């Protein structure tokens, strides 16, 4: 008798994706982050759903409804902080996932990589709109500053901003539409994730050596399901530590003050996971130039496959490229730190140097060093 798992139309899809999927035998723990991202997405959707049951998207009651969730709803504070810190874990996994793709040359799977970039933009948009919902000072002013960037668009800039605001300033209409988009986008993200997996399973996964692994495959279950579960437990530990011991560690104290359009905070800054892009934006004195640099700082990932000059796909046996990638990581950490500092000397200069280094590394230095490494193969 044939197994229902392999014959039923629904279970057949699950079976070919997560059970009998042929996977390379040598993929390391760096490949765990895809499944961790899936777990984070599920956590965000579930906690978000429960928060939406008690939240009101109205400027007069939004702030107090969040306070009500934390004070009066059974375990509301746990749900709220799981959602807020879950977003931080989501982005941490995202950045590592992208970094692993760069290190091991996974960007050569172009469809999977491009859908991944679309996913990154969508998740960033969702997180930004979610940050506006508690309607604290940083929520309001963050929304004002970031949406105002669109006014740099030639000809239609002002109309575009007013269209997004639903008026002449960030107000009730803005909050309502941000809540609507914040609610629907995770489901759109889920659809994109399915397409991402579809394209990945068309080609098969990459591996640390960057060589074809068709000659040596193992079933996904039980080997990688157990491995992913270990990763999940190791992710839950820091998340729970954050939620139960210092839930506001990654937040901004200004967001515990209700939004006040008449009082600007001394330092407007987004959540930590946007600070690198925010630092790049601020390092350019021109408004339109800053906006373009901000967009290009993430969109640059799309042209990385075109800049691949190395003969080896993976960086595993390319020590110079490895060194440069870790310099890039250090540079991004520097940008993240700068994004959280005041706009004054010496932070302005450091931010500008770090921004120049970021683009130089990706566009010029790394492709050049890859060519040098190609020459070194003949020595």
Curated annotation (Swiss-Prot):
Binding positions (heme b b562): 83, 182
Annotated GO CC locations: mitochondrial inner membrane; respiratory chain complex III
SUPFAM superfamilies attached to this UniProt entry: a domain/subunit of cytochrome bc1 complex (Ubiquinol-cytochrome c reductase), Transmembrane di-heme cytochromes
Compartment(s): Mitochondrion inner membrane
Cysteine pairings via disulfide bonds: none
Cofactor note: Binds 2 heme b groups non-covalently.
One Pfam short name: Cytochrome_B
Residues reported in the UniProt entry to bind a ubiquinone: 201
Co-factor requirement: heme b
Gene Ontology molecular function, alphabetical: metal ion binding; ubiquinol-cytochrome-c reductase activity
Main location: mitochondrion
Domain of life: Eukaryota
Transmembrane segments: 33-53, 77-98, 113-133, 178-198, 226-246, 288-308, 320-340, 347-367
CDD domains: cytochrome_b_C, Cytochrome_b_N
Main function: Component of the ubiquinol-cytochrome c reductase complex (complex III or cytochrome b-c1 complex) that is part of the mitochondrial respiratory chain. The b-c1 complex mediates electron transfer from ubiquinol to cytochrome c. Contributes to the generation of a proton gradient across the mitochondrial membrane that is then used for ATP synthesis.
PANTHER family: CYTOCHROME B
Protein family membership: Belongs to the cytochrome b family.
Oligomeric form and interacting partners: The cytochrome bc1 complex contains 11 subunits: 3 respiratory subunits (MT-CYB, CYC1 and UQCRFS1), 2 core proteins (UQCRC1 and UQCRC2) and 6 low-molecular weight proteins (UQCRH/QCR6, UQCRB/QCR7, UQCRQ/QCR8, UQCR10/QCR9, UQCR11/QCR10 and a cleavage product of UQCRFS1). This cytochrome bc1 complex then forms a dimer.
Protein name: Cytochrome b
Gene: MT-CYB
